[in-house]
Amino acid sequence: MVNLQRRLLTTMIALSVVVPVVAGAAPLLGQETVYVMSNNVEKNQVIAFERKNDGSYFEKNRFDTLGRGSGGVNDPLESQGSLTLNADHTVLFAANAGSGNITVFRVLGGSLWVTDKEPSGGSQPVSIAEWGNTIYVLNSGGAGNVTAFRLNGSGQLHPIANATAFLSANATGGSSISVSPDGETVAVVERIAGNIDTFHVNADGMLSAAVVNPSTGAGAFSARFAPDGKLIVSETGPANEVDGSAISSYTVLPNGKLAAVSQSVPTDGAANCWNAITPDGKHVYVSNAGSSNIAGFTIGTSGTLAPIAGTIVGSNPDGSTNLDIAISGDGKFLYSLNGEVGTVGVFAVRPDGTLDEVTQIPGLPAAAGFNGIAAL
């Protein structure tokens, strides 16, 4: 089996030379496609669902990562970004938490071709971020760290020398990683410790030591940079507080410290763990996993957050745990990964930021540990 996997990987890499992986290359897109990672402990896969002309979706294919997931049920990774597209949607990265490596796929018409699989540089990779062919991997296990790689034109990863930086301590629960639009700052949320770490990126790709910022709100879980450079952070809220989740925004100062802009704006729901920002930077949506709904906010010019239409803009099936959300590259659709019911919710994004439910894509097991979602 090992030899077979190696031969398959070699074949995929050879094929990738025909269509090089180059940042800025025109993406070869098919119909609207959304990807979900199975995170299966024996054989991790990426499941592709494609939109038909009538607006319905079908399972296009399942693509092996050649690695292993963590297994478990209902959000075992407790992270955002385990499945990540690059900026121009020509490359997809998958974190194999069980086998400790990263798989690189070339995206061709919605289908995926493996171009590389490399050790993550630590234990239990759970989140991946990309900026200009530099790839950052968050390893949450053991002495949690961020490891940086270069992606070459053939879709292969190469570790950057001395470009591993550690989190504030062991077992802090690293749960998300994001890179600023200018590529100069990497932000990591330590879910258990309640910190937001920032790392300055030097010209040679090396990362500074972590600047540790205590979150202004309880339960920081995921952070995403908006196109204007503001950092948007989802907060689950104080323990045992009903519908106590919130969202905050920050400015990153030159010294790596964070200055709050909007502090703990209520999301009117429970367990807000994930957020997704529209490509134009005007709106952010958060996933209230504990109350099966989606809240929306307008992002002001200074980074202030204001609720859209009474805050709750979308609902998922009763009893579902919406694990993660993603927005399509054109900003027209929002996708919600729904645990406990095994669906992907599809919503159309209106110009004013409100959502219209389109459909629920079936086909995922109701009780399984799938994690990660990304959309073309």
Language-model features, listed with the residues they occupy:
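Residue position within the beta-strands of beta-propeller blades
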Residues: V36, A94, V137, V188, ...
